[in-house]
Amino acid sequence: KMIGEVTSKQIAISVPTARSFSRTFTLPIATEKALHDAVVLEADQYIPIPSTSLYIDHQVIERTKQEITVLMSAVPRVVIDNIVTTVEAAGFQPILIEPSISSVGRVLTATEEGSLPTVIVDIGPASTDIAILDRGTIRVTGGLAIGGNTFTLDIAKKLNVALENAHQLKVLNG
């Protein structure tokens, strides 16, 4: 059941962090002219999927006289294409697509001063997303194929209680 009314056809979409790749890396300042090529080279070295099968984006997040620090994000084309097809079929226009942990990071950076490094751990039902923010920018992301459901099952087994009771214990006691 929907609460309220959707008044805009433009939407932002988050992709599961487990389906995306994000990484920061440093390059000599002279490389900035060929930044796109350097980012693709980094993707080829770091990501186990050919760069031709990825949508890759990047942002310079830090600059000194000698070097630049770049944040690269990449998602398999098939993942993005399927999402866009579904969203457009529903009558919406995607204007932003980003890893879900990046969305959480942006919210935290907007609400915090960002002066201390921060670790974000987003525990979902089936997976856990992790990001490290430093100076208001995501530096590293990762994910685990373990989420809240795993914890609930473990509690149920260890305490020999029903899943519903295990879930309540997890929520109430952490």
Question: Where does each model-flagged region fall?
Answer:
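Glycine-rich phosphate-binding loop plus the immediately following alpha-helix
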Residues: 78-104, 137-174
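Gly/Thr-rich phosphate-binding beta-strand-loop-beta motif of the actin/hexokinase/Hsp70
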Residues: 1, 10-16, 66, 109-141, ...
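Active-site neighborhood for divalent-cation/phosphate handling
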Residues: 10-112
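Phosphate/pyrophosphate-binding loops at sites that engage ATP/ADP/AMP, CoA/4′-phosphopantetheine
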Residues: 1-10, 90, 161
